[in-house]
């Protein structure tokens, strides 16, 4: 993953150049097709996912409860807390995703501690919005 491209993604935009280069080493970029189930409700969460391009629906009990697009992040609550996915997320268009595993975040947390704080704030906001997936 290219550090310059990471800087264009809102989650990473405030990181220093050094931190961006560190994250770029560990971030995995994946392309998926429309209809692909990105996460399954009830599965254990081991990574956070950032939508770089495309859109997805969050599905809970068979109902679409939210739509996600570029810049949106999901999976970080379950990943940080070691919990299970709280909803299915399904691609509604071709997508490009950036993922970071729990283990990768542990390895780079000194470089990106300010970003982890931002994730904690995001989590607090999600606690107030049950439509957001973990």
Residue locations for each model-derived region?
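A small-molecule sensor/coupling module
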Residues: 2, 17-22, 85-86, 102-134
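Regulatory nucleotide-sensing modules
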Residues: 3, 7-61, 68-70
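Short histidine-centered beta-strand/loop micro-motifs
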Residues: 36-43, 77-79, 88-90
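Short hydrophobic-aromatic micro-motifs
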Residues: 50-51, 74, 97-99
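Short beta-alpha junctions and helix-cap segments that line functional grooves
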Residues: 61, 74-77, 84-86
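A short, polar/proline- and glycine-enriched secondary-structure boundary/capping micro-motif
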Residues: 68-69, 77-78, 108-112
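Ligand-binding loop in jelly-roll beta-barrel domains
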Residues: 80-103
């Amino acid at each position: 993953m290219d550090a310059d491209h990471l800087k264009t993604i809102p989650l990473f935009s405030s990181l220093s150049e050094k931190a961006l280069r560190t994250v770029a080493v560990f971030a995995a970029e994946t392309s998926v097709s429309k209809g692909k189930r990105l996460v399954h409700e009830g599965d254990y969460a081991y990574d956070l996912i950032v939508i770089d391009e495309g859109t997805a629906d969050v599905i809970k009990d068979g109902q679409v409860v939210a739509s996600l697009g570029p810049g949106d992040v999901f999976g970080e609550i379950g990943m940080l807390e070691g919990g299970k996915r709280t909803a299915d997320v399904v691609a509604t268009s071709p997508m490009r995703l950036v993922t970071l595993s729990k283990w990768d975040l542990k390895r780079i947390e000194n470089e990106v501690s300010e970003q982890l704080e931002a994730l904690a704030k995001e989590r607090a906001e999600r606690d107030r919005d049950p439509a957001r997936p973990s």
